[in-house]
């Protein structure tokens, strides 16, 4: 994905303010609630029967944080997303058999969470940069599927 210097700056400056655990848990929780079929990949997480259970589930919160830590790796390697996510792509493709469309869904939910948390600070230009990033990450994660 091609990011301008301004877009890279918009991503990195906002990222430094992101509450990783809170935002990651919220994003994964929202994915499981808004797109309930995605919960089939998380059967071992215990109670995912309703929104309250999902958002209070410690395994959801922990895995969501892990997902955002991986986004942090992407932000450190904006010019090499495919290389950064090669092993995760292989894991999600070969072992977990995750539908790559789910990466796009989660990316969009991450953008929604950031917009909610940062309000007016999450400008249109910032959204453009983040949408490019989450699309690039989704593409990198789907790389092994091709």
From Swiss-Prot:
<dbReference type="InterPro" id="IPR000971">
    <property type="entry name" value="Globin"/>
</dbReference>
<dbReference type="GO" id="GO:0004601">
    <property type="term" value="F:peroxidase activity"/>
</dbReference>
<protein>
    <recommendedName>
        <fullName>Hemoglobin subunit beta</fullName>
    </recommendedName>
</protein>
<feature type="binding site" description="proximal binding residue">
    <location>
        <position position="92"/>
    </location>
    <ligand>
        <name>heme b</name>
    </ligand>
</feature>
<keyword id="KW-0349">Heme</keyword>
<dbReference type="GO" id="GO:0005833">
    <property type="term" value="C:hemoglobin complex"/>
</dbReference>
<comment type="function">
    <text>Involved in oxygen transport from the lung to the various peripheral tissues.</text>
</comment>
<dbReference type="GO" id="GO:0020037">
    <property type="term" value="F:heme binding"/>
</dbReference>
<keyword id="KW-0561">Oxygen transport</keyword>
<dbReference type="Pfam" id="PF00042">
    <property type="entry name" value="Globin"/>
</dbReference>
<dbReference type="GO" id="GO:0072562">
    <property type="term" value="C:blood microparticle"/>
</dbReference>
<comment type="subunit">
    <text>Heterotetramer of two alpha chains and two beta chains.</text>
</comment>
<keyword id="KW-0813">Transport</keyword>
<dbReference type="GO" id="GO:0042744">
    <property type="term" value="P:hydrogen peroxide catabolic process"/>
</dbReference>
<dbReference type="GO" id="GO:0046872">
    <property type="term" value="F:metal ion binding"/>
</dbReference>
<feature type="binding site" description="distal binding residue">
    <location>
        <position position="63"/>
    </location>
    <ligand>
        <name>heme b</name>
    </ligand>
</feature>
<keyword id="KW-0408">Iron</keyword>
<dbReference type="InterPro" id="IPR002337">
    <property type="entry name" value="Hemoglobin_b"/>
</dbReference>
<comment type="similarity">
    <text>Belongs to the globin family.</text>
</comment>
<dbReference type="GO" id="GO:0031838">
    <property type="term" value="C:haptoglobin-hemoglobin complex"/>
</dbReference>
<feature type="modified residue" description="N-acetylvaline">
    <location>
        <position position="1"/>
    </location>
</feature>
<dbReference type="InterPro" id="IPR050056">
    <property type="entry name" value="Hemoglobin_oxygen_transport"/>
</dbReference>
<feature type="modified residue" description="N6-acetyllysine">
    <location>
        <position position="144"/>
    </location>
</feature>
<feature type="domain" description="Globin">
    <location>
        <begin position="2"/>
        <end position="146"/>
    </location>
</feature>
<dbReference type="GO" id="GO:0031720">
    <property type="term" value="F:haptoglobin binding"/>
</dbReference>
<keyword id="KW-0597">Phosphoprotein</keyword>
<dbReference type="GO" id="GO:0043177">
    <property type="term" value="F:organic acid binding"/>
</dbReference>
<keyword id="KW-0007">Acetylation</keyword>
<keyword id="KW-0702">S-nitrosylation</keyword>
<dbReference type="GO" id="GO:0005344">
    <property type="term" value="F:oxygen carrier activity"/>
</dbReference>
<feature type="modified residue" description="Phosphothreonine">
    <location>
        <position position="12"/>
    </location>
</feature>
<dbReference type="GO" id="GO:0019825">
    <property type="term" value="F:oxygen binding"/>
</dbReference>
<dbReference type="InterPro" id="IPR009050">
    <property type="entry name" value="Globin-like_sf"/>
</dbReference>
<feature type="modified residue" description="S-nitrosocysteine">
    <location>
        <position position="93"/>
    </location>
</feature>
<keyword id="KW-0479">Metal-binding</keyword>
<feature type="modified residue" description="N6-acetyllysine">
    <location>
        <position position="59"/>
    </location>
</feature>
<feature type="modified residue" description="N6-acetyllysine">
    <location>
        <position position="82"/>
    </location>
</feature>
<dbReference type="InterPro" id="IPR012292">
    <property type="entry name" value="Globin/Proto"/>
</dbReference>
């Amino acid at each position: 994905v091609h990011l301008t210097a301004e877009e890279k700056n918009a991503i990195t400056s906002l990222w430094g303010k992101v509450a990783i655990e809170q935002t990651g848990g919220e994003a994964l929780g929202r994915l499981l609630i808004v797109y309930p079929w995605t919960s089939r990949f998380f059967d071992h997480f215990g109670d995912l029967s309703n929104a309250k259970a999902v958002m209070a589930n410690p395994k959801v919160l922990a895995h969501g944080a892990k997902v955002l830590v991986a986004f942090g790796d992407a932000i450190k390697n904006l010019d090499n997303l495919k290389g950064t996510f090669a092993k995760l792509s292989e894991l999600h493709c070969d072992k977990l058999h995750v539908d790559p469309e789910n990466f796009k869904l989660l990316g969009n939910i991450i953008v929604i969470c950031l917009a909610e948390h940062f309000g007016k600070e999450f400008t249109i230009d910032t959204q453009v940069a983040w949408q490019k990033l989450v699309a690039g990450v989704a593409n990198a994660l789907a790389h092994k599927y091709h």
